[in-house]
Amino acid sequence: MSDYSTGGPPPGPPPPAGGGGGAAGAGGGPPPGPPGAGDRGGGGPGGGGPGGGGASGGPSQPPGGGGPGIRKDAFADAVQRARQIAAKIGGDAATTVNNNTPDFGFGGQKRQLEDGDQPDSKKLASQGDSIGSQLGPIHPPPRTSMTEEYRVPDGMVGLIIGRGGEQINKIQQDSGCKVQISPDSGGLPERSVSLTGAPESVQKAKMMLDDIVSRGRGGPPGQFHDNANGGQNGTVQEIMIPAGKAGLVIGKGGETIKQLQERAGVKMILIQDGSQNTNVDKPLRIIGDPYKVQQACEMVMDILRERDQGGFGDRNEYGSRVGGGIDVPVPRHSVGVVIGRSGEMIKKIQNDAGVRIQFKQDDGTGPEKIAHIMGPPDRCEHAARIINDLLQSLRSGPPGPPGAPGMPPGGRGRGRGQGNWGPPGGEMTFSIPTHKCGLVIGRGGENVKAINQQTGAFVEISRQLPPNGDPNFKLFVIRGSPQQIDHAKQLIEEKIEGPLCPVGPGPGGPGPAGPMGPFHPGPFNQGPPGAPPHAGGPPPHQYPPQGWGNTYPEWQPPAPHDPNKAAAAATDPNAAWAAYYSHYYQQPPGPVPGPAPAPAAPPAQGEPPQPPPTGQSDYTKAWEEYYKKIGQQPQQPGAPPQQDYTKAWEEYYKKQAQVATGGGPGAPPGSQPDYSAAWAEYYRQQAAYYGQTPGPGGPQPPSTQQGQQQATEANGYELHL
């Protein structure tokens, strides 16, 4: 046995058969220990008998006796077993304790209370404190827990829970906080969420909830907390929908409420409880920015008011009302005309009518697209009338008058509107270099599809070979209205970075070649009525009265196609032009004529006059017939009487003809064709049709020098395609 004392006499000889204390019973100490306690002291058999037990002796036991040593060994074993149990619970390896090393807590300490004369109760209390101090770090005090009520939007609960509870489980695992969502919001816009855990865990769970709600609303993460829990950035407003009118707000298949949400930029929830009576008013919850919520409320009330006035859901000649607007069907090939270049036309309609117009997205298979007009009912109807008038003008437009001399068949002036179209609609054929066809078609045909969608025309590559059989060119066909073809032509020219070359007269080509009138840019190249503003100059161009009816003038439908005339036109160009005149001039033309003919160009100074080319047809009679038919149109009622400029223009062109032939004022016109009568008749009829008041100076024929310059520009103008 080891000696735990630091001083005193050495221990006596061991007893012959028993415990280490000799006659333990004589000491007057406590009763002997349990039977197994003698293992350390080497006591003999028996418990409590003579020499056995190893029980600690009484106070009279001398220091260094066997009793205190046995007591200390039992305590050390208990501490060691407690440490091993704690190590197993904590998952750490058990620590082996060496009782004989000074590192153990009791190896080098004095037995102050043991050696003193303190009572036993104080000794046991001190031993208990020592055990508690060693077992304390094994079981740390539990952390503080808290429970907080948090509120989230009722509509975001499903997003927070996730599919199969995946999202809420992730929140609990990542934050270490228990999340419990209330089963019902009680009709309120927010639902209560109970968060239980340590303060830092609760805070982390709140941040994760904020991120989920912010992403669900389409905003950046972390911006919901202030909105949903007392902030001012979001507004929730409820309005009561009268019984039986909830279907008006929802619409067929939810179409109306979807349109309201898209137009106002808010979220709408119509709270419907299956247990409620159908005759009970139902709340409509609107969530969004304050001004958007207010706008949405007004839109909903407008729908309800229209229903009360008997106007909701009624159809008229312009389309069907949906959500306070009007739907107008527009032929797919005419969408580009309604929109206009760079959206100019649709912007003008919106500004004039005070509405908003949007084309609904569709699959592109139907023959029409729907233009949805939004605004007050009277303004919507006004915009619908404008669109329908525009579409009607596209269905009937004026036939184009003859084009410029030498104008290639099937072509049209680019950008300025000098050329005009003949028969309505139709198609045009152009040749494009083979190596640039891919730019027009695009990968998978995406470029040509985009051109068709933007312009409303139909562009395709022709299987026919070019007229000269050149393999380096391909033919493209564009079908549609003149405006659509022109728009598609410009887009193709931008793709190939060059002009298109028209090929052959096709259906809907231009009018026949004829004398070209003076150049005056303007819509549809109406002739210049009215008196000339400057002395010696030609009459200026006067625009027709502003109005939607004049934007796209009406034209008469053509007569049935004659195959005999078509065959003759294919073989003989003159026969083709003659067929054109006989076909189109037998019917009354539209109210707005095309460009007027121009006088022949005078020869340059010092050069002899050139005789007219041989084989060139004389279109003088055709022009006279053309303007006579135009003159048959009655004058507009209420228009003031117009001054007749016939004589002034006749005199002007006579002088031009004399100068062109090299003669003086009294010289005969010679072989040069005289268009004086045609011009005079044209301007007289134009002045009568448009109702323009004459200028203050009256008709003043232009000077000879300016007239020469005008005629030279007219005949020397090159038509760029």
Curated annotation (Swiss-Prot):
Record's compositionally biased regions (Pro residues): 8-17, 398-408, 502-521, 529-543, 588-614
InterPro entries per record: FUBP_C (IPR015096), KH-I_FUBP2_rpt1 (IPR047372), KH-I_FUBP2_rpt2 (IPR047369), KH-I_FUBP2_rpt3 (IPR047370), KH-I_FUBP2_rpt4 (IPR047371), KH_dom (IPR004087), KH_dom_type_1 (IPR004088), KH_dom_type_1_sf (IPR036612)
Biased segments, Gly residues type: 18-28, 36-69, 409-422
One GO term (biological process): negative regulation of low-density lipoprotein particle clearance
Function: Part of a ternary complex that binds to the downstream control sequence (DCS) of the pre-mRNA. Mediates exon inclusion in transcripts that are subject to tissue-specific alternative splicing. May interact with single-stranded DNA from the far-upstream element (FUSE). May activate gene expression. Also involved in degradation of inherently unstable mRNAs that contain AU-rich elements (AREs) in their 3'-UTR, possibly by recruiting degradation machinery to ARE-containing mRNAs. Binds to the dendritic targeting element and may play a role in mRNA trafficking.
Cross-link (Glycyl lysine isopeptide (Lys-Gly) (interchain with G-Cter in SUMO1)): 122
Residues recorded as bearing N6-acetyllysine in the entry: 88
Protein name: Far upstream element-binding protein 2
